[in-house]
């Protein structure tokens, strides 16, 4: 299913209260007229959407739109939801869907500095998803009392304060943080790279290398013997270390170093802006199209891309846009523990 185009508007208001989303915006009459607005699930197969109630008012050559929707009234599913307008851009009565864009920089900053969400009656939460685009995108998912609270936001601000007030001290540690998917796993290249460091790196280097994992997860057992160099995911210490780390080393994208699908926050924005990622990957670049996710210049840009062959290096250079100096042919860390059990007789 092809994604709809975008119509940029001038934002006036965007709020979430008790399950209700309210949007107020302006659009010059010469740029088109919006007939209706809907909340549309971002899904390549399903076509699910729910209508906004909308009122309009004219202000000179501009039309002011006021729209609202109460998500408690609809069977929402865990997903990203775009605000989509039915718009006639040429004034000929030909209406087409277009994602509402134009989230103002001021409002975007406000949503980051002062995060907000609304809880629904069925244990879910709704909040605006703020990324590089300026589109009106909503995320709907289960409410997690551990992280979806103002107490946790206070923890983020305190961690940032403790980092910046002693920034030279923390930066001097030259920390390396290693993780795998969601910081819940230790079974791939991240684990074996960490083990190699623990067993072969000089003591002065080992003291600054840490594996990040939720210690309640089963895979913690794989790194437990190096517990002094294992740090609890989302602990206060970890949040300071994440701010200070010289290198983030992972088999996955930078988002895996933090709570998955967390609401907007200044902490999240600052850490995701980092470009010092060493990408160990999984070893599937030769047949899996990941260039849109990991391309150079994107939100998941890597400082160093680890590959296993010249063939793979060419793929990363040609399709991902990295220079050869940013791609190292080392093989994959987990290959170091492979044992040749073949029988020469066969």
Go through each PLM region and give its residues.
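Active-site and donor-binding regions of nucleotide-sugar-utilizing enzymes
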Residues: 26, 47, 58-64, 175-339
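Basic, ligand-binding patches in group-transfer machinery
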Residues: 1-175, 199
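A short helix/loop element that forms part of the nucleotide-sugar donor recognition site in Leloir-type
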Residues: 340-346
């Amino acid at each position: 299913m092809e994604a709809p185009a975008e119509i940029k508007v001038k934002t006036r208001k965007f709020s979430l209260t008790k399950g209700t989303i309210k949007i107020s915006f302006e659009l010059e009459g010469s740029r088109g007229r919006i007939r209706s607005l809907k909340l549309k699930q971002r899904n390549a197969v399903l076509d699910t959407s729910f209508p906004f109630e909308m009122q309009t008012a004219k202000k000179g050559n501009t039309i002011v739109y006021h729209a609202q929707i109460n998500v408690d009234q609809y069977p929402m599913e865990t997903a990203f939801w775009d605000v989509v307008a039915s718009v006639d851009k040429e004034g000929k009565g030909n209406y087409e869907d277009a994602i509402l864009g134009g989230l103002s920089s001021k409002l975007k900053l406000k949503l980051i500095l002062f995060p907000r969400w609304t809880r629904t009656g069925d244990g879910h939460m709704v909040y605006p998803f703020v990324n590089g685009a300026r589109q009106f995108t909503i995320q709907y998912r289960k409410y997690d009392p551990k992280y979806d609270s103002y107490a946790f936001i206070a923890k983020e601000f305190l961690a940032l304060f403790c980092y910046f007030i002693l920034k030279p001290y923390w930066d001097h540690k030259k920390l390396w943080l290693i993780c795998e998917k969601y910081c819940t796993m230790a079974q791939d290249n991240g684990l074996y790279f960490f083990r190699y460091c623990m067993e072969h790196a000089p003591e002065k280097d080992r003291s600054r290398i840490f594996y990040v994992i939720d210690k309640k997860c089963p895979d913690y057992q794989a790194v437990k013997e190096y517990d002094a160099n294992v740090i609890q995911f989302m602990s206060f210490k970890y949040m300071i270390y994440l701010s200070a780390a010289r290198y983030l080393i992972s088999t996955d994208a930078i988002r895996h170093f933090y709570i998955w699908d967390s609401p907007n926050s200044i902490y999240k924005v600052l850490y995701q802006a980092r470009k010092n990622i060493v990408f160990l990957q999984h070893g599937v670049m030769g047949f899996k199209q990941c260039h849109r996710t990991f391309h150079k210049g994107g939100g998941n840009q890597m400082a160093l891309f680890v590959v296993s062959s010249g063939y793979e290096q060419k793929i990363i250079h040609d399709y991902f846009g990295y220079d050869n100096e940013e791609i190292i042919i080392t093989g994959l860390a987990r290959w170091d523990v492979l044992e040749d059990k073949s029988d020469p007789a066969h």
